[in-house]
Amino acid sequence: MERARRLAYRGIVKRLVNDTKRHRNAETPHLVPHAPARYVSSLSPFISTPRSVNHTAAFGRHQQTRSISVDAVKPSDTFPRRHNSATPDEQTHMAKFCGFDHIDSLIDATVPKSIRLDSMKFSKFDAGLTESQMIQHMVDLASKNKVFKSFIGMGYYNTHVPTVILRNIMENPAWYTQYTPYQAEISQGRLESLLNFQTVITDLTGLPMSNASLLDEGTAAAEAMAMCNNILKGKKKTFVIASNCHPQTIDVCKTRADGFDLKVVTSDLKDIDYSSGDVCGVLVQYPGTEGEVLDYAEFVKNAHANGVKVVMATDLLALTVLKPPGEFGADIVVGSAQRFGVPMGYGGPHAAFLATSQEYKRMMPGRIIGISVDSSGKQALRMAMQTREQHIRRDKATSNICTAQALLANMAAMYAVYHGPAGLKSIAQRVHGLAGIFSLGLNKLGVAEVQELPFFDTVKIKCSDAHAIADAASKSEINLRVVDSTTITASFDETTTLDDVDKLFKVFASGKPVPFTAESLAPEVQNSIPSSLTRESPYLTHPIFNMYHTEHELLRYIHKLQSKDLSLCHSMIPLGSCTMKLNATTEMMPVTWPSFTDIHPFAPVEQAQGYQEMFENLGDLLCTITGFDSFSLQPNAGAAGEYAGLMVIRAYHMSRGDHHRNVCIIPVSAHGTNPASAAMCGMKIITVGTDAKGNINIEEVRKAAEANKDNLAALMVTYPSTHGVYEEGIDEICNIIHENGGQVYMDGANMNAQVGLTSPGFIGADVCHLNLHKTFCIPHGGGGPGMGPIGVKNHLAPFLPSHPVIPTGGIPQPEKTAPLGAISAAPWGSALILPISYTYIAMMGSGGLTDASKIAILNANYMAKRLEKHYPVLFRGVNGTVAHEFIIDLRGFKNTAGIEPEDVAKRLMDYGFHGPTMSWPVPGTLMIEPTESESKAELDRFCDALISIREEIAQIEKGNADVQNNVLKGAPHPPSLLMADTWKKPYSREYAAFPAPWLRSSKFWPTTGRVDNVYGDRKLVCTLLPEEEQVAAAVSA
């Protein structure tokens, strides 16, 4: 006991001494680095911060009674401090490092005073909800949605999302925070999964080429229509659509046809006539929208005999049991992969597809994954044939599509991997069997006439009063499709049960007893599909689709692929003009709630009041942010938003009788989607240049506008500019366009530097699309999903797109409307991901959003300042600052060291980073955008990597490293290369792998050497190869 007492006494004395020392030193400031957990930069400027004062009463003193402040009892789970990474002290330090007293001084010097807003204030959520308040608000909204059992069909079906895919892909930031796989060496996992997706599509459709996803089935059909026009070089200007196609698909095609000067004719199959000689293509549905399964063999022969290309819209699940379109001779096949394990989500997002023959591969839209080899001859994957795409070919591109639906394509591919060919066929047979039981039961009841044509999953019923039956079904929480006053269809899916069929029998029996059950009818049901239309050809024969059918195996496969890909889980992704910011967990949570996922897009609006309230609130918030008067939420990608906005401008001019206004002025520095979208709208493009400081040449704009004042339709402009500068003359540019009869279209790609500081409407724009997957936190998903809603001024609001099934328009709705047709297949686009942006805005509040813009600008200027001694910063504003992104110039290194931007980007992989945007908007440069979500420590780490690489370049310039055989040209360095038996590099394996100290504790490893792009396009292979062919390809390489 005595020993214990002495030890306790010593402890008390020691604590008293330490307390005294802490109090003595509390007033003395110390220079301490802002210390991240992973790494403290040896080159980072230091922050002066006082040590925290210990307010705990010393031993033996009486505690003082203190009152509790109101702030102390406010909610602690506020969100802006979790999203905006720079602390107030860091903000001040970084601003001073850039030459300003504080962050506001930097912002005042950067954003032109003439366009600066005083403040931004929301009518709702202005102070911002806490995370727990936001979750409760979303729970309340979800409770206002009513999930009825859907038999509507029309291309949207309920599905079982395998929980292993739900948890490990859809809810996994390692999958959903990846960027489009431009940097192939750190993207091999999702490239493999997307190649799996393409293989699923080619196997099931019977055509050899597929892309890696499109936005939805309607836009896929419209892209196919454009292909038919291009294949025949625009010589035939009529496109025929069979009336058995989904109505939303027909409407999207009609809208798109206007820009191509194509005439769309809708006709019953039996009445289609090619005698005019002017038909470029024909679109049919297989199975039809009302369920019929037809033999198209003779139809296709007849079309081809008349020089007409055949497009077939189809259903992947049906193709597991039906003869594939390729065997009929279809030229192009489109459809949606939604029912392969992707929730309906009130319309999206879903991965569509387009398959075609090798002959038309270079006319295909969208990203295509191909097989190539790396520097060691090992098979590697990459995005193939990029020279077709908008970022290279601009107005000559095959399509304006950029972001597609990669995340959803990966989910659908994994669904096929998990079930395999036998499992998919079993699901299809079950669905067909349930439809057959229902058809047989209705015949036995004798209360309605059932369609006699073969069907797969949809039964067409003739009855005396379709609306009365639909109303009766609604009372049992069942949704049927009403085709007309005497026609109903019921579509079955993998979630349908025998009990559901029994409920349908009761609805049609109108209160009369049903003398049988669905289960009792099952033995009597015959296969409705004739043998001539039954699939005989094999599919999904590759081992990948036949070995991962247990959850353990699929889980390991998913994680094997995931481990190959760099995402925001690993490090910042500083891609200029891409805004790879935080996708917060609270924002993502509602996306997988059944009350949001399980609603059909054509369900009665009164069943989706939670969604509708969110749309209204979001529309109001976006109007406040942008300074516009009305919004359309329908465009389901940025490129779709661009197209919609230009078509709204076109409709406005048409309404005034200005049919001749078709000239669109576009700066040479514009995103590639801008000229591609303008071309799709039938506009004549006139380009204007930039001055030496990267600003749009105002005099060139003036001359172009005045020279075309009678025909001027629009100007497309990005603000801040794609050069990373707030142009002083933007308001003058807008005035010039308006004075000459045009409208100003603002590309919203750089909205992250506007929110709360200025706005498109305040600047003078008439319409703008917002990339919700950039500024407003929807994750990029490895190449989609995205959303591109458009905001407009009052005079353009009447022309916002509507929908043929569920009428829509602007939010808020204008008094008078003359809407466009549908831009997307679903009324509100990819509605399921709108909660992400909604929760982000509502939690940040107006102040948090404004701070986010300021910190994004601060971070970019801090990085530019740190790097300017090592790399030239190409463009700056009038006060020497940059916007939220900046460009470093690497062009000189080609002459001094033989080094190009690609070499720097590949070497950055060895440092654990994704490279910035390469050679755009200026060839030979890198464009860097840090976003507000990245900590100062992460910014410093990336700057240190680039500074270290600059020294590696210097070693080449000094002759200390070989021009051809050096650490940059050899990058990246995967483990397979580093562990090889022989090493012939003039630098060490250790330096190749660990060029920076932070890599010792945590390193992301590229899994392949530098991929050979030329080989991949020269020997194009876009599906999984059998193993023996993989070996042969490697040997030949």
Swiss-Prot record:
Q: Which residues carry this modification: S-glutathionyl cysteine?
A: C98, C402, C463, C777, C943, C1022
Q: Which GO terms describe its molecular function?
A: glycine dehydrogenase (decarboxylating) activity; mRNA binding
Q: Does the keyword S-adenosyl-L-methionine apply?
A: no
Post-translational modification (record): Glutathionylated at Cys-98, Cys-777, Cys-943 and Cys-1022 after S-nitrosoglutathione treatment. S-nitrosylated at unknown positions by nitric oxide.
Keyword Cell membrane among record annotations: no
Please state how the activity of this protein is regulated: Inhibited by harpin, S-nitrosoglutathione (GSNO), nitric oxide, N-ethylmaleimide and 5,5'-dithiobis-(2-nitrobenzoic acid).
**Chain's role:** The glycine decarboxylase (GDC) or glycine cleavage system catalyzes the degradation of glycine. The P protein binds the alpha-amino group of glycine through its pyridoxal phosphate cofactor; CO(2) is released and the remaining methylamine moiety is then transferred to the lipoamide cofactor of the H protein.
Give the protein name, as stated in the record: Glycine dehydrogenase (decarboxylating) 1, mitochondrial
Its organism's taxonomic lineage begins at:
Eukaryota, Viridiplantae, Streptophyta, Embryophyta, Tracheophyta
